[in-house]
Amino acid sequence: MNTIIPISPINNLKTRLSEFLTLEERKNLLFNMLRDIFKALKGLNIYAISKDPEILEFCNNLGAKTIEEKGKGLNQALNQAFSVVNEDLLIVPADIPLIRESHIKEIKKLKEEFEAIIAPSRGGGTNLLYLSRASLINLRYEGFSFLKHLEEFKRNKVSYYIYDSFYLSIDINTPEDLGEIFIHGDGSYTKRYLESLNIKVEPKHSSAGRFKIYRE
């Protein structure tokens, strides 16, 4: 199975975390999330696509083949990657550090029966997408891409499976998202890195959110 990981440049990285983490800290957060993701993807052919040479060098050192992104936007980046590899494809975002090898084993079984497998994010996005062939659908990332991709499956009569996983639904975009790593990320590079920054998490039962995230 071939895996494509599209990655934003460091300067545009996780801007919703910018009031909580410095740019250097966000870069190191990304690198530790990638370590967790690569660990889960062990044994697969991994392709990283980015405009950022530092990110590509890091991924190459982890064992990935790298593609220098030429276009603009996620859909264009992935279509560019499809010119390199276009069958037996698993698209994995760079911000789902709770992915596990067990998820990949299940996907390998499911792909024997279904042409496409999709895991939604909590916000209605697409956090994992398997396609037996790149030509099955038009990619429709951005916005509520989960629903858009379901429309594509139905329009093109593609057999698909919705992989509804809590762990795969967690993507890291805001300070509150970091709380999920403290609860569910034991043993991960990402959690160890956040702990090294003296970040603390407390429960918060209110409409304002689930966690109180702060630094000592």
From Swiss-Prot:
It catalyses: (2S)-2-phospholactate + GTP + H(+) = (2S)-lactyl-2-diphospho-5'-guanosine + diphosphate. Pfam families: CofC. It comes from the Archaea. It is an enzyme of class 2 (transferase). Pathway: Cofactor biosynthesis; coenzyme F420 biosynthesis. Gene3D superfamilies: Spore Coat Polysaccharide Biosynthesis Protein SpsA, Chain A. InterPro entries: CofC (IPR002835), Nucleotide-diphossugar_trans (IPR029044). Signal peptide: none annotated. Keywords: GTP-binding, Nucleotide-binding, Nucleotidyltransferase, Transferase. NCBIfam families: F420_cofC (TIGR03552). Guanylyltransferase that catalyzes the activation of (2S)-2-phospholactate (2-PL) as (2S)-lactyl-2-diphospho-5'-guanosine, via the condensation of 2-PL with GTP. It is involved in the biosynthesis of coenzyme F420, a hydride carrier cofactor. Homodimer. This is 2-phospho-L-lactate guanylyltransferase. It comes from Methanocaldococcus infernus (strain DSM 11812 / JCM 15783 / ME).
